[in-house]
Amino acid sequence: MDSSDRPSLRQRLSNWGRTDTKPAATDLTAPPNDPSENMELPPLPPVELLGYSHSTRTKIMTTELADEIRNLVPERIKLYRSWQLQYSLEQHGTSLTTLYHRNIPPHGDTARNGFVLAVKNSRGQVFGAYTDQHYHVGGKKFYGNGDCFLWKVKNADSFQAFPYTGENNFVVYCNPHFLSLGGGDGKYGLWLDDALKTGVTYPCATFGNEPLGDEKFDVVAVEVWRVGE
């Protein structure tokens, strides 16, 4: 081999460790692995319930029930630990007008809040709803978005929720005479009268729900909780 054909020292050093095998092509369209994909997020702390009076005898909400509901709310709402009691039938009186008044957010902004309605009937059945807006008279319009859902406690260890189906937009409708959630074929998913004494619950297209309790019932307790700032 002629000396002129030999690689120079600089070339030999620059080729140190190389092989004749071409490296595998890199797929530039494939995203890099996200190390957080395999990370288990820490559990959320238990919900802190604020607003019950020491003398209140009938309390619907528990930390266990609140945790079940929190599992289904939007992520931004899920992060709030404190739930504030806005209205209690026992503490504030049996009036739908009072319920509406006490639900007005302190800063007028509901974008950072969620609202949980809880009802207990005379047979001890517990059920309710989660909504993205506070309960208020909305004229002749329905309101609420796809984050809303109905829920029920079937027994001490069984919670069931009914999410928005998209079949119609009859999510929440309130007027001075009644409060309602869900609808279709002339039936409400949940309906309460203006005195908060009686109510009805039927299957409805909005949430694809079964009756949340007895279809016609007498009210024992009603609560509304604000989740957020």
UniProtKB/Swiss-Prot annotation:
Q: Which residues form a coiled coil?
A: none
Q: Which InterPro entries match?
A: TLDc_dom
Keywords associated with the record: Mitochondrion
Gene Ontology cellular component annotations, sorted alphabetically: mitochondrion; nucleus
Q: Give the main location.
A: mitochondrion
Any one GO BP annotation for this protein = response to oxidative stress
Instruction: Note down the stretches annotated as region Disordered.
Output: 1-44
| Mitochondrion is among the record's keywords | yes
Location(s), subcellular: Mitochondrion
* A Pfam family it matches: TLD
Can you give the residue ranges of the TLDc domain?
59-228
The UniProt similarity line reads: Belongs to the OXR1 family.
User: What PANTHER family does the record point to?
Assistant: MUSTARD, ISOFORM V (PTHR23354:SF62), NUCLEOLAR PROTEIN 7/ESTROGEN RECEPTOR COACTIVATOR-RELATED (PTHR23354)
Query: According to its UniProt entry, what is the function of this protein?
Result: May be involved in protection from oxidative damage.
How is this protein named in the record?
Answer: Oxidation resistance protein 1
Q: Which gene encodes it?
A: OXR1
